[in-house]
Amino acid sequence: MSMIGKTLAQYKIIAPIGRGGMGEVFKAKDQKLGRDVAIKVLPEEFARDADRVARFQREAKLLASLNHPNIGAIYGLEESGGTNFLVLELVEGDTLADQIKKGPIPVEESLKLAHQIAEALEAAHEKGVIHRDLKPANIKVTPEGKIKVLDFGLAKAYAGEQEQLNLSNSPTLSDAATQQ
């Protein structure tokens, strides 16, 4: 069933953005505030699974604990007509994966991008959050060259350096090494 044209609370779904392990992401219009947002919808089959709903809510809380210019912001955790969804900052631009496919990124630009990614991860780590799925597809580069790290769906809160991390349930375990 297509979500395009449907309204969830005050958000009118405009277009698909992408699909991941924990849901679909759409561009939407916040009809109260008049701004474009991203809506991450928990699939109907997951909404019946208490563990998946809890994980979705945990993602929202972890993301809400982060406030950094290089991390995509969350505006809310909502439910409308039995549909659970996150309201997120809409980040325009290509993913880093898209930019890499176009060809080599000049060294000077690569250093600027890497610095911004490191700052985002440092801010998350200072709040006790490890992304666990950092990869070029989860990093947006705005037209102005600003990095936004997205998709904290597999993020884990940790108590400190002594805690052992269990990455065995990560669907993109091969990307985990970049975060260690």
Give names to the regions the model predicted:
Residues 1-180:
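Conserved ATP-binding/catalytic core of the eukaryotic-like protein kinase fold
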